[in-house]
Amino acid sequence: MASLIYRQLLSNSYVTNISDEVSEIGARKTTNVTVNSGPFAQTGYAPVNWGHGELSDSTLVQPTLDGPYQPTTFNLPINYWMLIAPTQAGRVAEGTNTTNRWFACVLVEPSVQSTRREYVLDGQTVQLQVSNDSSTLWKFILFIKLEKNGTYSQYSTLSTSNKLCAWMKREGRVYWYTGTTPNASESYYLTINNDNSHVSCDAEFYLLPRSQTDLCDQYINNGLPPVQNTRNVVPVSITSREIRYTKAQMNEDIVVSKTSLWKEMQYNRDIIIRFKFANSIVKSGGLGYKLSEISFKPMNYQYTYTRDGEEINSHTTCSVNGVNDFSYNGGTLPTDFSISRFEVIKENSKVYIDYWDDSQAFRNMVYVRSLSANLNDAVCSGGDYTFALPVGAWPVMSGGAVTLSSEGVTLSTQFTDYLSLNSLRFRFRLTVSEPSFSISRTRLSGIYGLPAANPNNNVEYYEIAGRFSLISLVLTNDDYQTPIANSVTVRQDLERQLGELREEFNALSQEIALSQLIDLATLPLDMFSMFSGIKSTVETVKSMTTNIMKKFKTSNLANAISDLTNSMSDAASSVSRSVSVRSIGGNATSRISTAIQAGDDLRTVADASTQISSVSRSLRLREFTTQADNLSFDDISAAVLKTKLDKSTQISQSTIPDIISESSEKFIPMRTYRVIDNDTAFETGIDGHFYAYRVDTFDEVPFDVERFNKLITDSPVLSAIIDFKTLKNLNDNYGITKTQAMELLQSNPKTLKEFINNNNPIIRNRIENLIAQCRL
């Protein structure tokens, strides 16, 4: 059968080159996963300053330890721990504010009985009473005096095997570690004037900011690691740590380094980012009460603003990633409001904004390092969207909000209709905000996030202000421009080509001959026969099929097949056991409110139909994985695809993979499946309709859910090419034999072709309806 092409794609789509797979993920426009691209992932050139790039959240980067520094006297910076590492007993450090506080620290070796030792403190020789009863631990002792000519008194001790102590000035106090390792902790003993207090140190030391207090605790209690990551290889003077700060202007070009051919330019720019979300709202066929999709789309926006008196022409592209799919089903009747899928961005989503302007900073953005940005947050609030139904009150989706916070910036390339622009991609993480969104006149309410229905809330644009800085390697001669390196992003001409191709495909449905379609659907279409009729690709079928298989691997059908067992068991078990209900037909509105008693669970037929719909979606997988000679919906969709590929004038090697993948997911969305038990047929549809009827008379009988659950597990599942309504209509108007009825129930292609060749209007209308559903 023609659906062999889908089976062949599935069975051969699991061998792929990893680099191609990475490129595929990076180029994907809409996906339900988060892609964390590296800072140089979008260009073909290496960074000037080699580094690890971005790291996963679970990866720990050990902070660099600032030091070691040579013994010296200096004004210890406020909010910095001074971690001292002496190697021998004696005076370690001392300090004073020169008015009313003098403090000193001495180190005593193990096993020292109480004794008096001489130390030179504050320029004077003094005797201090010291002792250390431990035979293994060294002991730091803190002495303090309150007058210039006063005597030192012992205030605190720290017993340690690591010979490390630390103190810090903050909030007008001196903080010090006390206790015994590995349980030593910080405390304070002095109130001083932090600005005028100097420290004299007799040993090597390190500096740690207050934000790394936990790391300082670790060093004090456990010692320095064997090979710690330090700023200096050997101890250096503390003066080498002094940095000359220059006040940077918001917008300036600085020559960092220069040779005869190249120079490094630092560009500092303030920036105003304006962006908009785009969306797509697609209605399903029928009476106009059902929507197929509400989704986000990339949106380009051009604008101008003034920077330091200069008018800047800017271009942004806004896209989203990691969207969340929601749905709403108001019932199974054609007049019941429902949305098959609508996208919402939440905490697990990302927003990408690619920015370019015509300033000097973007003219040579190829070799870039030290790229950074500081941006304000932005709140995006959803507006009202009214679903204009043909009859009845109109539901309104309203509310929803998210806050965008800057997460990072990388290089990217924006593609327009005329040229490629090297640009900056700003990544934003999301947090949900008030209010939540809801759909009026439905039970859907209290959901947080920003839905795709009206994400711009009727405002012209959202705006984010900030600044960025980068160092770019450019030619010394400003008259030359570094060539732009092409790269892959989500905005390519491919999307435009696919849009035109979809329109052509949908228009070709009127040109398909029904009899030839049935013949084609019965043929075993393989990879070569499927694509051999395409003139532009006949010589590249082998290489093209590799791309098709890689694309098909990520389709919904491929993912669903891999989870077939779980999907079937979960869906089947969700339907109530030991219960019989009446079928739901097109005119059975009076039965919708009928209650079904299932143990202690009281539900409506409408609820049961929703569960039946879930089972029906899994029945495609059940049929797909079993070989049969009967015609299936996938056979018809593959035959329609083959016919349209042969007739298309716009098909190309780059668009075929997307078309093949989309066709497997979107062709014939309203499918009906049946299982046969002796003289009774059970038929369920994706739309939630379900029937049970006699195969000889087509009279309806109660739908035995328990029996149905057993049949879909043990019996063949058949595509209802000719569904129950069509069969009953055919029998009432023309009359058919029991043999013909069984063959139509089993979707026998020979019998179908006979009815078509005899111009039976009921059968022809049904097949034409299926072809019309083969839309992209």
UniProtKB/Swiss-Prot annotation:
Site-annotated residues for Cleavage: R231, N232, R241, E242, K247, A248
Record key words, sorted: Capsid protein, Coiled coil, Disulfide bond, Hemagglutinin, Host cell membrane, Host cytoplasm, Host cytoskeleton, Host endoplasmic reticulum, Host membrane, Host-virus interaction, Membrane, Outer capsid protein, Viral attachment to host cell, Viral penetration into host cytoplasm, Viral penetration via permeabilization of host membrane, Virion, Virus entry into host cell
Motif YGL motif: where in chain: 448-450
Region of interest (Hydrophobic), ranges: 389-409
GO terms under biological process: permeabilization of host organelle membrane involved in viral entry into host cell; virion attachment to host cell
Motif range (DGE motif): 308-310
Alphabetized Pfam families for the sequence: Rota_VP4_MID, VP4_haemagglut, VP4_helical
Disulfide bonds: C318-C380
Region Spike body and stalk (antigen domain), residue ranges: 248-479
Chain intervals for the UniProt region annotation (Spike head): 65-224
GO cellular component terms attached to this protein's record: host cell endoplasmic reticulum-Golgi intermediate compartment; host cell plasma membrane; host cell rough endoplasmic reticulum; host cytoskeleton; membrane; viral outer capsid
Coiled coil (residue ranges): 484-511
Region (Spike foot): 510-776
Record HAMAP family: Rota_A_VP4, Rota_VP4
Misc. remarks from the entry: This strain probably does not use sialic acid to attach to the host cell. In group A rotaviruses, VP4 defines the P serotype.
Record-stated family: Belongs to the rotavirus VP4 family.
Name under which the protein is recorded: Outer capsid protein VP4
Species: Rotavirus A (strain RVA/Rabbit/United States/ALA/XXXX/G3P11[14]) (RV-A)
